[in-house]
Amino acid sequence: MNNPIRKRLSTEARCTQLLDVTRELILEHGLNSFTMELLARKAGVSNPLVYKYFSTRLVLLQSLLQREFDFFYGSLLTRLNQTDDFVAVVHIFVSINFDQESNGKILPILLNLADVAKVLGTVGPKAQNKVGNILVDSIMKAYGVTRKQARVMAKIASGTSIAAAENFSVVGGNREQTIDSAVQFILGGLETFKR
């Protein structure tokens, strides 16, 4: 029996591979079932190689959280900073909820672990507040409401968006049409708050 020849990867590529496999395993089997040994087996590498890159399970999970957080909030802020159009802002937020739902909910899983989440320090809450403030500021500008009212409106819009994304993940259908319908539903609801 021939053993497949393993390909030697660069340090960055191997680290990315291990983080990708970790993400897949957690989403598929749950965090409690995840072990470094399972990661090694599924990644097709030795246990010592996994520990060469990540000395502990905690370090691995923190690295995964940092990567996923940076990607998620980095891409979200980039997209939001490229538009002043309120409808486009709402569309971005709804699309992000659909992306999160279809790609799995790795961020909430990892953020719920205090020892893992501490890797973000104050950056995590600051990024979340910044994104939230962009939506609140956009609502204030578009509808001429107070900050307090805009926060309520943002919460309602967010709940609608999340519910639409969760429903789509179960029922399926045309993704873009469903996103557009959710955006129109949100905009219609927000209209009721106009002065």
Q: Whereabouts are the PLM-identified features?
A:
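Short hydrophobic clusters on alpha-helical segments that form packing/core surfaces
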Residues: R14, L18-I26, E68, N97
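Hydrophobic alpha-helical segments that form the core
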Residues: I96-D99, R147-V170, N174-G189
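Helix-turn-helix
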Residues: Q17, L25-V59, S63
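Solvent-exposed, amphipathic alpha-helical segments
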Residues: V21-E28, F71, S75-Q82, T160-F168
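N-terminal intrinsically disordered/low-complexity leader segments
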Residues: M1-A13, K194-R195
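Amphipathic alpha-helical packing segments from all-alpha helical-bundle domains
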Residues: D70-G74, A117-G144, R151-K155, D180
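Amphipathic alpha-helical segments used for helix-helix packing
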Residues: F98-T122, E166
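Hydrophobic alpha-helical connector segments
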Residues: S63, R67, L77-N103
